[in-house]
Amino acid sequence: MNQKKQIKSDNLQQQQQQQQQQQQQQQQQQQQQQQQQQQKQHIKYLNSNFKDVEKNKILVHLIAGSGSKLVESLVMFPLDTIKTRLQFQGDFSRGSIKNRYSGIVNAFKTTIRSEGILSLYRGYIPHTLYVLPASAISFVCYEAIVQEAKKSKKFKNMMFDTSGIKAVKETGEDLRNGGSTSTSSGRFGVLLPIFVMTIARITGSVLRTPFDVVKMRQQVSGSLVNEHVKKTNSTAFNSALKIIKTDGIIGLFKYSYVSLLRDLPFTAIYFSTYEFSRNYQKHLINRGLKSGEKKKKLSSINNLISGSLAGAFGTTLTIPIDVIKTNLQTQDLLPKEKRVFNGVISAFKYIIKNEGFKGLTKGLSTRLIHIVPSAGLSFCAYEYIKKLLL
């Protein structure tokens, strides 16, 4: 009897255990179903807000591009003001007083002492109104070019791998043998964003000119007090109205082609240097990996280095046209008899004659101090914001 009771109790325990296991399994299944439903709802929510993943990416690049530029401009704009003043003060050789600033440090001290620290942000509003949307569009085009270029194997080798010489040789052999690399859909895909970037940059340079003219005149007019340049605390809007009143609406777009001469090569050098540096660093940090090992990703420091190099190369190679641009767009602050520049060639000859070739690099150190960390910070912030959103 005792054995029978024991058997019954054992059976009951087994049944209870089985029931508990079944209940646990049911609970797990219910949890899995709930998780799946939540995932489906989340996907539906994302799809309702972003119907197309590519549109979502474009929005991310727009936000990251404008956000990175906002961070960079807040930190670095004072250096842009100092750079503009140093470049402009060469015009005093046509006035009645000598150069006011002896260098970067002296310019900072003099400006803050005589006008206050906020004067370093004079012209910031017209600058921001342009650079935020322009930066957003530039980064969207840049991402499109990179993604489309990576679809083409040979283009990828030439642009993104360190073994680019071999790819160039192969491409040349294809052409010599009667083949055409342009038939690749990847290369056609690359041409479109490059074309879009070019058109966007041309349009942007023209539209940027009024903001640049107002910004630079505000930057220089506050401190250069002599019989030619009067001190003013006018707003950006009032400065624009004054230009229109004096020179008409075309005064805001004067020498817009000079902006184009600077911006197009700068953009090409800027983004290509950044991408080359990033991919070269990827090659360096992953060259010791064995087959099957996960590739290491670039850190914020790597992005900072790449961005800084891009800014350094772009700035150094385009500084002569930047000096000419500043002089052309600010000389209207002087009386008509003191305006000796009629265009790029005229400005180039005048600067060489009176200041030598060194005059074409005026403000380079300040511009490098401004652009190099600005570019590094901008790309670093861009990659970080993009990582957060994607």
UniProtKB/Swiss-Prot annotation:
Compartment list: Mitochondrion inner membrane
Lineage top rank: taxon: Eukaryota
Classification via Pfam families: Mito_carr
InterPro entries xref list: Mitochondrial_sb/sol_carrier (IPR018108), Mt_carrier_dom_sf (IPR023395)
Predominant location category: mitochondrion
Protein name: Mitochondrial substrate carrier family protein U
Compositional bias per record (Polar residues), positions renumbered to this chain: 1-12
Family per record: Belongs to the mitochondrial carrier (TC 2.A.29) family.
Record-level GO cellular component terms: mitochondrial inner membrane
UniProt biased composition (Low complexity): 13-35
Keyword entries, A-Z: Membrane, Mitochondrion, Mitochondrion inner membrane, Repeat, Transmembrane, Transmembrane helix, Transport
PANTHER family for the chain: MITOCHONDRIAL SUBSTRATE CARRIER FAMILY PROTEIN U, MITOFERRIN-1-RELATED
Species of provenance: Dictyostelium discoideum (Social amoeba)
Mitochondrial intermembrane face of the membrane: 1-57, 146-186, 272-303, 382-390
Purpose of the protein: Mitochondrial solute carriers shuttle metabolites, nucleotides, and cofactors through the mitochondrial inner membrane.
Repeat region (Solcar), residues: 56-148, 188-280, 298-388
Membrane topology type: Multi-pass membrane protein
Annotated GO MF terms: iron ion transmembrane transporter activity
